[in-house]
Curated annotation (Swiss-Prot):
Keyword field: Cell adhesion, Cell junction, Cell membrane, Disulfide bond, Glycoprotein, Immunoglobulin domain, Lipoprotein, Membrane, Palmitate, Phosphoprotein, Receptor, Repeat, Signal, Tight junction, Transmembrane, Transmembrane helix
Annotated protein name in UniProt: Coxsackievirus and adenovirus receptor homolog
Glycosylation sites noted in the Swiss-Prot or TrEMBL record: 106
Source organism per UniProt: Rattus norvegicus (Rat)
Signal peptide: 1-19
Disulphide bridges, residue numbers: 41-120, 146-223, 162-212
Bilayer-spanning residue ranges: 239-259
Amino acid sequence: MALLLCFVLLCGVADFTSSLSITTPEQRIEKAKGETAYLPCKFTLEPEDQGPLDIEWLISPSDNQKVDQVIILYSGDKIYDNYYPDLKGRVHFTSNDVKSGDASINVTNLQLSDIGTYQCKVKKAPGVANRKFLLTVLVKPSGTRCFVDGSGEIGNDFKLKCEPKEGSLPLQYEWQKLSDSQKMPTPWLAEMTSPVISVKNASSEYSGTYSCTVQNRVGSDQCMLRLDVVPPSNRAGTIAGAVIGTLLALVLIGAILFCCHKKRREEKYEKEVHHDIREDVPPPKSRTSTARSYIGSNHSSLGSMSPSNMEGYSKTQYNQVPSEDFERAPQSPTLAPAKVAAPNLSRMGAVPVMIPAQSKDGSIV
């Protein structure tokens, strides 16, 4: 009887306290960067909930250094979504009529800064309810690169590497062979799920096309690799070629330097010759003195000739100088030189010259 009474009392309390409630359970949500996160929040009202309906979403950032901040609010039949600058324009109610019992929101174009705890709070007096959701934003693997680290020659040791440019941990790797038998070499089986495969004592059987797939909880990426295991190269020939090439380069450089040096020396010599001061050449003899010498020599010749020898000799104009010896430009008239007395001429070093006189008939006096 006592147990039955207690059950009736508990039922009465439950009925009395039943009011607004959120039916969506708390949960953890993981989404990739750039995607849209759906945060559900559905509620039910009771007849006794007669107050105005207020819906409020808050965020607690993951760094735990900031207090809870409102990101979107519904109150008085109006929506306010300009509270949180980091989510401005990226948070919206999913329902056009939140009074119908759906206060869910979408957060678009997710960023790493959106990671945190989101709380949905619904109030309609006297009912109050809230739910929390943990949002985690992950980065999909992308920009994955496959490559050979080392020399892919027979007998060598090298590594096959698979490296994504970005991607949230944890990451899972899977290697596959796409060509020939499509079977991974037996020594590699232990590392098929590793980002690095260590190849020991490589053989030509390892040649082929391989793929590496990287994935995490929000996405995956893949890269391809073509492996060609070739015979060892002729290293002696390579070294000899490198040495010969180096010597030829040195010879060429030496020839260029020699030519440049020679050209500079020639230019320097030309400059020195161009600026060298030379002794002036003595001026040509005076035409007047030449003419006088010519006249004097003629007179001397005439003086030594007898009258009989002069009969066939044409009369020479002594007062004229042959034009072929003296062709000069006309000069401005000059004053006649002043006469100098004979004693003064002797002091000046003049030598007297005897000029034979000539009569009217041409005979020498």
